[in-house]
Design a protein with these regions (language model features):
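Surface-exposed helix-capping loop/turn segments at secondary-structure junctions
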Residues: 41-42, 85-91
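Short, hydrophobic, well-ordered secondary-structure elements
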Residues: 32, 64-88
Length: 244
């Protein structure tokens, strides 16, 4: 029995594109709210007396919101990009999609490149920063044990996470990517075309247009020999079928 094909346009659960977009929006809004709360606490900190017992609480809240807002925004990017990866892989099996996501990991810039998003070099670098936030900077303690190096690294990380210019640029980039992704398969001026060829040996799903790169996905029958899984075989089979 063949594995279930789950990436139809109305997939379920984690293979529902709309669900990924919804989660992305929640994370995005949460990141912005946290950042605003952090800025409010920084103002309270600046106005408070250094001897006030609540000063340490203000400091902790400011540091926590700097870090957590960046982590959430990083995950918002990931949910947004993976919603488009799902769409690009229409017709793929569950295992193939899981492998695709596993291979990407948290490499947001790689997803953006594969999706053909029209981003600048600086915007791709910003996605790399968001990837590092997810993997390390906004997630795990610093791994340095030397006291002097630890303090230096901690200060650099805190300054970078607190940088409002970086956060604002990330928010703007998210908005840009979302506006592009929202048009995938929804633009009347660039409609997507879907075709399927079902033969006894394999099923071929093909998509082009819709704002995404053209892609063909092949699902071989369970008894299809491994040695024959070649592009040359597929080309010959398609040509023979087209000639009928």
């Amino acid at each position: 029995m063949q594995s279930e094909i789950i990436t139809q346009k109305n997939g379920k659960g984690i293979f529902d594109r709309k669900a990924w977009l919804t989660e992305s929006k929640k994370l995005y809004l949460s990141a912005k709210l946290l950042r605003s709360e952090g800025e409010r606490n920084k103002k309270l900190l600046r106005a408070a007396s250094k001897k006030s017992p609540i000063v340490h609480e203000y400091i902790d809240i400011a540091s926590a919101t700097d870090q957590t807002s960046r982590l959430m925004l990083g995950y918002a990017f990931e949910m947004l990009l993976k919603s488009a990866i799902l769409l690009m892989n229409l017709g793929a099996r569950k295992k193939a999609i899981e492998n695709e996501f596993c291979n990407y990991g948290h490499k947001l810039n790689c997803m953006a490149v594969d999706l053909g998003l029209p981003l600048t070099v600086d915007e791709l670098k910003l996605l790399k920063v968001a990837s590092r936030d997810i993997v390390l900077n906004a997630r795990y303690p610093i791994g340095i044990v030397d006291d002097n190096k630890y303090i230096t690294e901690l200060n650099e990380r805190n300054i970078q996470l607190a940088d409002e210019n970086i956060f604002r640029d990330m928010v703007s980039l998210y908005d840009k990517i979302k506006s592009i992704v929202a048009k995938f398969d929804n633009d009347v001026a660039n409609c997507a075309n879907f075709n399927m060829l079902r033969l006894s040996e394999f099923t071929l799903f093909m998509r082009n247009g819709g704002g995404l790169s053209s892609r063909a996905i092949v699902i071989f029958s369970d008894k299809f020999p491994e040695v024959s899984k070649r592009k040359s075989y597929l080309k010959k089979a398609i040509e023979e079928h087209a000639g009928k």
